[in-house]
Amino acid sequence: MTTGRGRTAAVLAALLVAAAALGGCGKIYPTDEPASGPANGVKADVQDVVVGFAQQQLQAPYFAAMQVRAEQIAQEQGFTLLFQAANKDPVVQMNQMQAMMSQGADVLVVNATSVKGQFEMMTQVASKIPVTYIDTSVPGTGMTSVQSDNLTIGRESGKITAQRFRDMGKDSISMVILTGPATDEFVGPNRRQGFLDGLTEGGVEYEIRAEQSGEYAQDKGQVAAENMLAGNPDVDLILGLNDSMALGGYNVVNGKPQYDSVYVAASADGQKEALALIKSGGCDGKYISTGLNSPSLAADEALRISIEVATGQRVPADFPAESFTKAVGIGCENIDEYYDPNSVF
């Protein structure tokens, strides 16, 4: 079994390799100043534009949905999309970004693998090519980021869950939490804290019995939930920091009499399978809430910015450091506004 400390050490080792690749005998790129325009000059026709999309992973449906939406946009507008996923490895991601640049990328969209560990790497990359971050950014680098307000999304979901428990006559609950991987230094912690803040704001006290990584994947979330429930069968809530892990937890407790009083919620994502459970269960269902985190909205905005820069409509300095997609909690009372069975995600 790999411990948290072991995973962290492995991540740090990988980042040291990346740093050596960048810095060893000098920097790959001669300046730290951010790129002021497209890497290969302004393209008058969008069909001449090449966009590199460096995704951190594809294991979770949320990230896979980003790829689907990005490919749809590229087909609709006619630009070339170079898409690579790094399996959460910063060294792999660096190599992929360099490969995209050598293949003629004018701009990059990047979902970073490590908020803290990629600063030097991304400073240098962003000096050569305009970088728009999506979902996870490296603060202080790149031209802008498009992401979810994870703290607010988590809080809104937590408030909905708090109200459900209060409706059941409970103002104090025990819970277990399904977390992200060791490299999840920003998104997951914000989702976690936001949800807990929402419980508090909603008038519910909580006790965290256990936390375990589900790697943002349903199958691993299911295993982690089984492990935690084995020692804590009487908890009130399984919280997943995304719907995929929460769905894994749902699979563990659904239909099992010993877990009749165990409910499930997610901090974020709004995955259609989770929304279907919220809709079918109604206000007495086992899957209580989640938060809107649309991969399509994020991809739309990140690619809009990238194309505007690549075609000279705007320059990198025109954009704020960060912008956020719509933040809202989703529960039984507003499910019809957000559930689309035909959605990509």
Language-model-derived ranges and their functions:
Residues 51, 55-57, 70-72, 157-203, ...:
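An alpha-beta-alpha
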Residues 110-125, 195, 213-277:
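Hydrophobic alpha-helical
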Residues 93, 146-173, 220-222, 270-275, ...:
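Hydrophobic alpha-helical segments within soluble ligand-binding/sensing domains
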Residues 32-43, 48-69, 73, 82-93, ...:
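Extracytoplasmic "Venus flytrap"
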Residues 20-24:
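C-terminal motif of bacterial Sec signal peptides marking the signal peptidase cleavage site
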Residues 83-85, 138-163, 178, 280-296:
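Short beta-strand elements at the ligand-binding edges of bilobed clamshell
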Residues 116-152, 168, 174, 271-284:
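Flexible loop/hinge segments that line or gate small-molecule binding clefts
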Residues 12, 25-43, 47, 178-182, ...:
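Hinge/cleft segment of the Venus flytrap/periplasmic-binding protein
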